[in-house]
Amino acid sequence: ELFHHGPEDVVISLIKFIGTMVILLNIHSGLALCAAASLPFMLVFAYVYNGKLKRAFKRNRDRIADINAQLEDSLSGVRVVKSFGNEDAEMGKFQSGNNAFLESKKSAYKIMGIYNSGMGVFTTLVTIVVVVAGAVFLTNKTLEVADLVTFMLYINNFTDPIKRLVSFTE
């Protein structure tokens, strides 16, 4: 799935982003630069939290591997465990491994929530910056209302490829 849709998504997103940026620059270059000003912050945020997500998901895989290894050992030695009456000890080991997996899963979901919320904040911030800068440009009479409306309609075409590229790296 990744090899089929991945390169396609990257190419489409890059073309859409570059094309939209060219259109926005033609509508009003100052407003386009204001919209693009948040990109470095968004990319740094995405890079940092993408790394945290990868580490959290690796911890999840490690914890589930620990549980599977312990289960395999327990099942292969079930007669020995029963003969020595160690069922409670084995259940305790399983519960301990299960709790470690649960905690790593909670941590991963927390990081994922912060990451997705943060990306939402940055994309909303682009819209807010455009509205505020547009108001300033309207006040200075360097921007027409029709251009601001057109610009606002293109903003989603500007932020959607960024969100798609960032989610691709997840």
Segments from the language model and where they lie:
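Helix-loop-helix
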Residues: 23-37, 46, 111-170
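Phosphate-coordinating loops and pocket residues in cytosolic domains that bind phosphorylated ligands
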Residues: 4, 12, 38, 96, ...
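Residue-level recognition of pore/gate-forming positions within transmembrane alpha-helices
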Residues: 9, 13, 39-43, 120
